[in-house]
């Protein structure tokens, strides 16, 4: 063993985390971004492929990665700076959504992250580019990340963005990191824009989601499920009552989100919003056991016990023909390799490669997880 390799092994052994169950020799939990950068620099020097792990809730999305080393964020789980008057909070990547939302209740605030994933980590949600159902009202997660820090593949800690709330719709590193699946490095602390929880909220069960969406004024979400369609409303009591009356249907107080499911196979149709109804038909034609359709957003997530290759190929071809894609979000690795996690690479794939090369020139960070083998 070379001196460099021996030093790397000592570094990784010092930070070993035995609590994370993944199939690789080294699992390490740095306590700071500087330690993470040191690990990544050492991994680059000896040519080790690195994967990243938060709570493991999004590990089955993307092409399978054969990693020599896994870096976890379990030891970086602090709420660093909470400024409720400024509507911002800075958190480390290992903080779970449940922990974050619990800390915001004292001032009736929310980070508007996925509502049904309390065990997911902030870093994992950002890396996977996940947004909650309230995206219809508040926009995607990337629009609420004001500032972000990452440890790059070349072993440096970099920060981008601005702590000023008005910069939340700008461009830069926060947007590059969102949905990057760790291909640019380990996502660390992020500064999030917060929103006030509505004073009143209601869930309205309706017959036709699209018709109800056109009647509702700025609903939080409009969802179709295997059982019914629901409109989610938030605002003052007067606003909510008026909308409930205008929409009709059966209403209840509060936000009754769909129960999360954990099927052996989960697919996500990501299509222009006008094709949601057609995507629901495509999902059902594949014998979905459950589904949630996000009207006005263009996402239909569906669970399956099994699927045929021909049926899947036809569904993916349809999704791509209308300008979308069909993503395998959960499945055994061998099936994901057979079906292909993403489908056809996007037109921006070469630009993505250039960005990857800037942050991770040795290509060690989650190699091959993204479309086109990035």
Give the residues covered by each predicted segment:
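Short amphipathic alpha-helix segments
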Residues: 4-12, 203-222, 241-247, 270-288, ...
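N-terminal accessory segments
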Residues: 1-26, 42-57, 315-343
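FAD-binding subdomain of flavoenzyme oxidoreductases
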Residues: 106, 111-114, 118-221, 225-230
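Conserved glycine-rich FAD pyrophosphate-binding loop
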Residues: 61-68, 74, 117, 156, ...
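N-terminal glycine-rich flavin-associated loop
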Residues: 17-51, 73-116, 130-163, 199-205
